[in-house]
Regions:
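Boundary at the C-terminal end of the N-terminal hydrophobic targeting segment
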Residues: 2-4
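Short N-proximal segments of mature Sec-exported proteins
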Residues: 7-71, 75
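C-terminal partner/receptor-binding element of secreted or periplasmic proteins
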Residues: 77-121
């Protein structure tokens, strides 16, 4: 995963919130939606950047991943939600989908092969 030389990286959005806050969000669909959106963004970025990975979850559905995270967070309430997802992805590494075709993917993507015409300012 991408990080600085010490292994640190900035966490944005719901990923910086605690597992305890994730657990409490089960009763609030708007709050839970923020965690679900963060999870989808994390997985999309991981899929795009991790070598040999098309879908980090493999055959696991998004709802099953959320259920796994509920269990993890119940036991690790002080961990960040980002750390919980990292543990999920590490645990699923051997079951990940390595190429397109099949799987529980909700979409598809392809890395850009050419530099953009204009740099983003």
């Amino acid at each position: 995963m991408a990080a600085d030389d010490a292994g640190n990286y900035a966490i944005w959005g719901a990923g910086g919130r605690s597992c305890n806050q994730f657990e409490k969000s089960a009763e609030d669909s708007v709050a839970r939606g923020a965690f679900k959106d963060y999870l989808m963004g994390y997985l999309t970025a991981y899929n795009a950047l991790a070598p040999g990975t098309y879908n980090a979850l493999g055959e696991m559905t998004l709802e099953s991943a959320l259920a796994w995270l509920d269990g993890y967070c119940d036991e690790h309430r002080m961990d960040s939600f980002d750390r919980a997802i990292t543990q999920l992805v590490i645990g699923r590494h051997e079951q990940r989908q390595r190429g397109a075709g099949g799987g529980a993917s909700g979409g598809w993507g392809r890395n850009a092969t050419e530099a953009p015409a204009a740099a983003v300012q």
